[in-house]
UniProtKB/Swiss-Prot annotation:
PROSITE patterns hit by this protein: IF3
Naturally occurring in which organism (per UniProt): Streptococcus agalactiae serotype V (strain ATCC BAA-611 / 2603 V/R)
Alphabetized UniProt keyword annotations: Cytoplasm, Initiation factor, Protein biosynthesis
Record-given protein name: Translation initiation factor IF-3
SUPFAM superfamilies tied to this protein: Translation initiation factor IF3, C-terminal domain, Translation initiation factor IF3, N-terminal domain
Keyword Acetylation included in the entry's annotation: no
GO biological process terms on file: ribosome disassembly
Length: 176
């Protein structure tokens, strides 16, 4: 059953149809009833009559405690939002002529990002005439990928974009 916002559901006196297909508290079919009789049944049970499918012929109405239903629905939505994980892309910038110590520092940062579950975009910016030696940049990226292969997979291979070469790494998904 698709649940919609309050403004889309008609409750009790807001329902403006002659007869409805009535569904009971436990989900049992009570048949097609005139609206006044359905409202009386809901009032006797001290709960609400909610029109859940106005497009059906005849429209479907359910007897339920709307406040409790709304609370449960919001609780479910909140749980689903908690389960969603936000993946961010962190960037590590390198140079084609990077020194070993600097490379190790950048590598350590990249590994830290990957261990936290973030994706890492490794980029190399070519300045001046360095652009003529793209193979040096590709070699640096390959070295970075190889150094992180135990915790990451290459999501996007090295590619040029203007004066920049980049690749994207993603953490290896947990095997469950």
């Amino acid at each position: 059953m698709k649940i919609i916002a309050k403004k889309d559901l008609f409750i009790n006196d807001e329902i403006r149809v002659r007869e409805v297909r009535l569904v009971g508290l436990e989900g049992e079919q009570l048949g097609i009833k005139p609206l006044s009789e359905a409202q009386a049944i809901a009032d006797d049970a001290n709960v609400d009559l909610v029109l859940i499918q106005p497009q059906a012929t005849p429209p479907v109405a359910k007897i339920m405690d709307y406040g409790k239903f709304k609370f449960e629905y919001q609780k479910k939505q909140k749980e689903q939002r908690k389960k969603q994980s936000v993946v961010t892309v962190k960037e590590v910038r390198l140079s084609p002529v990077i020194d070993k110590g600097d490379f190790e520092t950048k590598l350590r940062n990249g590994r830290k990002f990957l261990e936290k579950g973030n994706k890492v975009k490794v980029s190399i910016r070519f300045k001046g005439r360095m652009i003529t030696h793209k193979e040096i940049g590709a070699k640096v990226l390959a070295e970075f990928a190889e150094a992180t292969q135990d915790i990451a997979i290459i999501e996007q291979r090295a590619k040029m974009d203007g004066r920049q070469m980049f690749m994207q790494l993603a953490p290896i998904p947990d095997k469950k």
